[in-house]
Swiss-Prot record:
Organism per entry: Campylobacter jejuni subsp. jejuni serotype O:2 (strain ATCC 700819 / NCTC 11168)
Gene: nhaA1
Annotated Gene3D superfamilies: Na+/H+ antiporter like domain
Name of this protein: Na(+)/H(+) antiporter NhaA 1
Membrane-crossing residue ranges in chain numbering: 12-32, 62-82, 97-117, 128-148, 157-177, 184-204, 220-240, 260-280, 282-302, 331-351, 365-385
One BP term from GO: regulation of pH
Database matches in Pfam families: Na_H_antiport_1
Location within or outside the cell: Cell inner membrane
Summary of the function given for this chain in its UniProt record: Na(+)/H(+) antiporter that extrudes sodium in exchange for external protons.
Length: 389
């Protein structure tokens, strides 16, 4: 019995299993949205949830609590990982930053350029230029793990490192390009919350409740400020102390405690809430619109070309080296997987077009098709067309 429990625990904590769960939730969302439960699915997402304290009221649809709230926890974890890597990890050595940074840069610039070329001249459709710049790390990592032992572990580290810069890029894009009205009062409150966390950090105080209260205040104020609330997650992470005064790991403990919830609750719920594309409302004209073509080309072509090209140039001009034990074929295979935009692309799509059905959901379908093609082709290429160097 203990052996069975151990095997189940190992399976659940396996990163590849988290990716499989995302796939299941995606298919489930598509089935529910296009089946007899579609009305209940939409009612579930539009259900108003909130609270009020005096004159202050926060009442949002459940979908927005997922996209603005739960995903902030995901970005908080990304911030913790980024801080850990810069202070004590691989990024402490500047040379180790170059390859994933250049790869992420190429993975943002080239897809954005392809989307812009297809949609040039239309100011509204151009708002979606950032949709194909994102990568769903959980999906990409899950498929990489399924490709076999001949893929060196250094490529997994490369993909994770690239993902950190990719996510930071997504946060900056959201903060700069998808922010509308700004509230000075909310910014002042956010600044005070940050100041308190800075003082807590400098004093070496490691009471989780203090940081939690400050982070909630920061999140609400950022939400009300006009800047996307996910920014609060990564900002909070920067003020979490690495360790307690007794030398015990503090940041690492918080990060590890969040991994399960993010992999098996937050991201699957996000996938279920956002992947429900109504296929019955899609027409042929919308499928071949500039937005759909731009998204598909950006994710499936632009991502792999941009990531590989910038990585190759960094290696060719000796700014960086290939991940240990890997070759260019294997590196290219990982670059293909970065075209799996899925959850993050759906997220940015919702911000760009404000969850509008003006494209008859063809934009969401294009994200799913491009992500599916990138995943399948990346798996086939890595599994059957690469050899260990």
């Amino acid at each position: 019995m203990n052996n069975i429990v151990h095997k189940l625990k190992t399976l659940v904590l396996n990163e590849a299993f988290g990716g499989v769960l995302l796939i299941v939730c995606t298919l489930l969302a598509l089935l529910v949205q296009n089946g007899s439960f579609s009305e209940h699915y939409r009612e579930f997402l539009n259900l108003k949830v909130g609270f009020s304290v005096g004159e202050f009221e926060l009442n949002k649809p459940f979908l927005l609590w997922i996209n603005d709230g739960l995903i902030s926890i995901f970005f908080f974890a990304i911030g913790l990982e980024l801080k850990k890597e810069f202070l004590h990890g691989d990024f402490k050595n500047p040379k180790n930053i170059v390859l994933p940074f250049m790869a992420a840069l190429g993975g943002i610039l080239i897809p954005a350029m392809l989307f812009a070329l297809v949609n040039i001249g239309d100011a509204y459709t151009l708002k979606g230029w950032a949709i194909p710049t994102a990568t769903d790390t959980a999906f990409a990592l899950a498929i990489l793990m399924m490709c076999g032992k001949h893929i060196p572990s250094s490529l997994k580290i490369f993909l994770l490192s690239l993902a950190i810069f990719d996510d930071v890029g997504a946060i900056l894009i959201i903060a700069i390009f998808y922010t509308t009205k700004l509230s000075i009062a909310a910014f002042v409150i956010a600044g005070l919350a940050i100041l308190v966390m800075l003082i807590l950090n400098l004093l070496g105080i490691t009471r989780k409740s203090f940081y939690f209260i400050c982070s909630v205040i920061l999140w609400i104020s950022v939400l009300k400020s006009g800047v996307h609330a996910t920014l609060a997650g990564i900002v909070t992470a920067f003020f979490i102390p690495m360790q307690t005064k007794n030398g015990e790991a503090f940041l690492e403990e918080i990060y590890e405690s969040l991994k399960f919830w993010i992999a098996f609750i937050i991201l699957p719920l996000f996938a279920f809430a956002n992947a429900g594309v109504n296929l019955s409302n899609i027409d042929i004209g919308a499928i071949f619109s500039g937005v759909s073509i731009g998204i598909f080309l950006g994710l499936f072509v632009g991502k792999q070309v941009g990531v590989f090209l910038f990585s190759y140039l960094a290696i060719r001009f000796k700014f960086a080296a290939l991940p240990q034990g890997s070759n260019l074929k294997q590196l290219y295979g990982v670059c293909i997987l970065t075209g799996i935009g899925f959850t993050m692309s759906l997220f940015i799509d919702g911000l760009a077009y404000e969850v509008s059905d003006i494209f008859n959901y063809a934009d969401n379908l294009a994200i799913l098709i491009a992500s599916f093609c990138s995943g399948i082709w990346g798996f086939i290429y890595l599994k059957f067309f690469t050899t260990r160097s």
